[in-house]
Every structure is written in C-alpha cells, then in structure tokens.
Amino acid sequence: MPRPENPIQLAVIGAAHGTRGEVRVKTFTGDPLAIADYGLLYDEQGKAYEILEARVAKTVVIVRFKGVNDRNAAEALNGTELFIDRSQLPDEELDEDEFFQTDLIGLEAVDGDGKSYGVVSAIFDFGGGDLIELSEKGKRPMLIPFTEAAVPEIDFDKGIIKVEPHAAGLIADEHDNPPHESGKKPKKP
C-alpha cells in the first residue's frame, strides 16, 4: 500500500533502546501492543515501516523495525510519526465518549453563546489527563482539559466542540483567579 490517502496517526517513535536497533514507541491505540496488528506503518513521506517485534517494557512499547539494525539507525527515527490508512481501522463502533484524535483536529471551540476560542490543533496526554490545544490566529495556543465538564458536547456535523469557559479555564473563576490559575486539576471523565 502506498502512502495512506486518509491517514490516522497510530504512533510516534521515541528514543533508541539498546544497541540492536530497537526504539521506544508511544502508541495511540487502546492496547499498546495492537500497533503490531495493523501491518505496515507509514511516515509522513510515505516510507513504510514493518514491525518485526514489539514488547512492553515498563511503561513503553519497544519495537524492532525491519532494516533498523543498530543504535544509529534507531536514533535517526526519533520523532517519526507513524500512520495507517483510516480503512485499516477495525469496523467496531466507538463508544459514545470515544473519538479518534484526528477527527477532533480542526473543530472550532465555541461556548454556549457562540463565542469562538479557536480551533483544536492538537491533543496531548502528559499523564494527568488529556488536554486539547486551541489555536487562534494571532494568539498563543491554549490548553484546556478534555473533560466532560470543560467540553460537554462534540458536534462533528457542525464542526464544533462546545466548551464551558469556566471549567475549561478560559475565563476567570469565581475567586477572580485569571484563566489557567484556578488551582484546580483537570480530571478525566
């Protein structure tokens, strides 16, 4: 299969692991080892990567790719994003509160009054729960928690996510703390 026509990011390659060409991989699959079930993976330029071996080591997945046989070759892959074509995803239905990250990118974030706070430009998980990055032309990107309180509704047909500005930290809280300084920690729904 050539470069995916409708790419879905499945993983990103991290640092080299050991001296035999293995790499650490951050996966975006429910089961981290499921990355090996999709066959060939592709980078943004369309280069194919075949997984020969994958295993979990502590909190990361260690992968050995075909043709990557030493540490230097492994180090050269650091930061490479890996994709599959959307058609390779399982046909099973997603739960109501499950989404493909790629489907959220580009949605406009609006409050109940229709005020725009930018568009979803990325989704991050730094260990404390998912965060949505909102970008607005001429402004610095903002991170908001991806919780039911902060993002109570997602409407793909309208191309929007509804945000609750107080819960998302977009406006001052009841104690007049500036946005993003309320001291509250985001929680996963």
UniProtKB/Swiss-Prot annotation:
The segments labelled Disordered in the record are 168-189
GO MF entries: ribosome binding
> Which SUPFAM superfamilies does the protein's record reference?
PRC-barrel domain, Translation proteins
Record-linked InterPro entries: PRC_barrel-like_sf, PRC_RimM, RimM, RimM_N, RimM_N_sf, Transl_B-barrel_sf
Query: Superkingdom of this entry's organism?
Result: Bacteria
Q: Which GO terms describe its biological process?
A: ribosomal small subunit biogenesis; rRNA processing
Composition-biased stretches, type Basic and acidic residues, lie in 172-189
How this chain assembles, per its entry, is: Binds ribosomal protein uS19.
Q: Please give the record's comment on domains.
A: The PRC barrel domain binds ribosomal protein uS19.
Q: Mind telling me what this protein is named?
A: Ribosome maturation factor RimM
Q: Native species of this protein?
A: Brucella canis (strain ATCC 23365 / NCTC 10854 / RM-666)
Gene for this chain: rimM
